[in-house]
């Protein structure tokens, strides 16, 4: 993804100054997809760009899920911020003052059947620009150890050998912390969806990491792994 968080969401390289990001997951029925994308890329991306130019956020992105069923999310928004104050300030989403358009005229709320929002803190990242990403969600038995090992072992290993990736990062979830939900995510970004699929199939050699305790830290592995592809970023 082009700038996941330099994102995202949660592919790309926007995390240089980012500390926080939110992901909004939505389920858009197929018959609404074209209108949903039109409104988001034509209007809401401009509002986000205005916010970015005025120092209120770092980036905004829209990605679509590759595959999946009709009963789950198929699009996600990624908003990237420097501070928690920025991330929780909903007043910045004001099309009337920014574009001179009434919010109801460009609302997409009626175009999706379900929505969920999560907030995250960036714990580690390596910059790069791609067009697709694998989002890996998990619930480690030891959250602090998971973050520490990614920062001290996996991050340095990927800096030497990205194993086909163009971007990588780790995020810790800050809300909706319940037993059935993930508490961390990592992202592996690639130049194309095809490369993301090859990665999932084990077709890229990966760096070797000594002294990893990840099988103890997260014995059940990732709880979900999803490929997403960029629709648009406010800042490429």
Predicted feature residues:
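Short S/T/G/P-rich N-terminal loop/turn motif that feeds into the first structured element of a domain
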Residues: 18-236
């Amino acid at each position: 993804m082009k700038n996941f968080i330099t994102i995202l969401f949660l592919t790309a390289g926007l995390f240089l100054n980012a500390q926080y990001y939110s992901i909004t997951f939505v389920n858009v029925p197929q018959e609404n997809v074209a209108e949903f994308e039109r409104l988001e890329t034509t209007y809401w991306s401009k509002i986000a760009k205005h916010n970015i130019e005025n120092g209120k956020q770092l980036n905004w992105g829209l990605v679509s899920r590759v595959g999946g069923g009709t009963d789950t999310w198929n699009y996600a928004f990624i908003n990237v911020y420097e501070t928690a104050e920025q991330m929780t300030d909903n007043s910045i989403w004001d099309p009337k003052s920014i574009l001179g358009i009434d919010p109801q005229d460009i609302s997409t709320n009626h175009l999706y059947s379900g929505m969920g929002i999560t907030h995250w803190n960036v714990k580690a990242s390596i910059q790069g620009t791609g067009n697709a990403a694998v989002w890996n969600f998990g619930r480690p038995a030891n959250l602090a150890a998971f973050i520490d090992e990614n920062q001290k072992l996996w991050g340095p290993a990927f800096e030497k050998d990205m194993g086909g990736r163009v971007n990588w990062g780790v995020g810790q979830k800050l809300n909706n912390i319940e037993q059935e939900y993930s508490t961390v995510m990592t992202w592996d970004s690639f130049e194309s969806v095809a490369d993301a699929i090859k990665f999932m199939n084990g077709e890229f050699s990966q760096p070797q990491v000594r002294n990893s305790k990840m099988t103890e830290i997260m014995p059940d592995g990732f709880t979900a792994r999803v490929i997403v592809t960029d629709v648009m970023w406010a800042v490429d």
